[in-house]
């Protein structure tokens, strides 16, 4: 079973190779959101500059859509803050995907993009 980090890594690599290279027109974006601090001091500093609990692991910008992706392993569940963030972005008309595998990510890209 892959870790959440390994699933995210596979998906980012796939996306960048398929949609994010210099020769791709349009060249799409997928980037991570570092939303964890190493300690309380760093966490407080990050909150002061905009850290938000529950934000998705990555964000995709297609030029038309903003898609928020949260990566979970087979047993992983969203925290209450993650669910709250999902509800917030969906209320703004944005897409939010919970991804558990590269295949699921590819399927979302095919059917929802």
Where are these regions (language model features)?
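Catalytic phosphate/metal-binding cores of nucleic-acid and nucleotide-processing enzymes, i.e., regions
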Residues: 1-113
């Amino acid at each position: 079973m892959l870790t959440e980090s390994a699933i995210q890594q596979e998906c980012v690599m796939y996306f960048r190779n398929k949609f994010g290279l210099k020769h791709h027109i349009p060249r799409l974006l997928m980037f991570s959101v570092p939303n964890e601090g190493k300690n309380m001091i760093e966490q407080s500093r990050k909150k002061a500059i905009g850290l938000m609990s529950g934000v998705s692991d990555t964000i995709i910008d297609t030029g038309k859509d903003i898609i928020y992706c949260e990566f979970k392993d087979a047993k992983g569940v969203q925290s209450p803050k993650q669910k709250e963030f999902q509800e917030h972005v969906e209320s703004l008309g944005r897409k939010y995907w919970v991804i558990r595998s590269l295949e699921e990510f590819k399927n979302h890209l095919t059917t929802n993009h």
